[in-house]
């Protein structure tokens, strides 16, 4: 089971170790708000893809307000000069949601080498720049262990190296207890758009076991 399902989704729940990316309560308009959250996330990820965004957490404490927490490797790109970019984003979200109380919090990811989303995006960017996929994967693995990772698995799928036939290659180092629900495993995917076609990148990073005070990070 642990080998097949998404490592993050497998651990989401009030009694488990991962939290939801959208926090809201709505009896009648849940579908509308959920689709709205997806659109907001899409605008942020596509508009600031150079910032290497790790996570977008959207909270709706009331019907009149929305709080958006963005974790990124390069927060300055999202903020812009004198806050110009974040002001544009705020106005776009106000127009999209018809809410006047829009709060955006930007957080810098300091240990980005053990953040699966950022690692996957970094590998994808290197593949687009024609760096060898083996070199990109091995570099990511080495950097992960330097920042405290206890295990990492990286997979690349597609026409690797311009080969005629698509294939999948992966590397794994350290522990990767996918069946252990208390294991803190970060998982993410990314796509590299190359001249040979799309190459899919998957990253799993094991950071140790959860304790009570480490939950919902």
UniProtKB/Swiss-Prot annotation:
Per the UniProt record, which residue ranges are transmembrane? none
Q: Which organism is it from?
A: Rickettsia massiliae (strain Mtu5)
Q: Which CDD domains match?
A: KH-II_30S_S3 (cd02412)
Family label: Belongs to the universal ribosomal protein uS3 family.
Q: Which domain of life is it from?
A: Bacteria
What's an example Gene Ontology biological process for this entry? translation
Domain KH type-2 per the UniProt entry, residue ranges: 40-110
Q: Name one GO cellular component term.
A: cytosolic small ribosomal subunit
Q: Which GO terms describe its molecular function?
A: mRNA binding; rRNA binding; structural constituent of ribosome
Q: Which UniProt keywords apply?
A: Ribonucleoprotein, Ribosomal protein, RNA-binding, rRNA-binding
Functional summary from the UniProt entry? Binds the lower part of the 30S subunit head. Binds mRNA in the 70S ribosome, positioning it for translation.
Q: Which HAMAP family match?
A: Ribosomal_uS3_B
Q: What is this protein called?
A: Small ribosomal subunit protein uS3
Task: Share what the entry says about its subunit structure, partners included.
Answer: Part of the 30S ribosomal subunit. Forms a tight complex with proteins S10 and S14.
Q: What InterPro entries has UniProt attached to this entry?
A: KH_dom, KH_dom-like_a/b, KH_dom_type_2, KH_sf_prok-type, Ribosomal_S3_C_sf, Ribosomal_uS3_bac-typ, Ribosomal_uS3_C, Ribosomal_uS3_CS
């Amino acid at each position: 089971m642990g080998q097949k399902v998404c490592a993050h989704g497998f651990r989401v729940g009030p009694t488990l170790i991962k939290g939801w990316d959208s926090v809201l309560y709505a009896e009648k308009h849940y579908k509308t708000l959920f689709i709205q959250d997806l659109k907001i996330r899409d605008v942020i990820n596509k508009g600031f893809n150079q910032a290497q965004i790790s996570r977008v957490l959207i909270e709706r404490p009331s019907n009149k307000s929305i709080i958006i927490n963005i974790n990124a490797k390069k927060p300055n790109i999202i903020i812009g000069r004198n806050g110009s970019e974040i002001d544009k984003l705020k106005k776009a979200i106000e127009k999209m949601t018809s809410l006047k109380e829009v709060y955006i919090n930007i957080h810098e990811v300091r240990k980005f080498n053990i953040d699966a989303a950022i690692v996957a995006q970094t590998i994808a960017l290197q593949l687009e720049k024609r760096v060898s996929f083996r070199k990109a994967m091995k570099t990511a693995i080495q950097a992960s262990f330097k920042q405290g990772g206890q295990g990492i698995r990286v997979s690349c799928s597609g026409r690797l190296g311009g080969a005629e036939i698509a294939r999948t290659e992966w590397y794994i180092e350290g522990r990767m207890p996918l069946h252990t629900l208390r294991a803190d495993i970060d998982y993410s995917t990314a796509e590299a758009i190359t001249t040979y076609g799309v190459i899919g990148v998957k990253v799993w990073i094991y950071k140790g076991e959860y304790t009570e005070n480490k939950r919902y990070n």
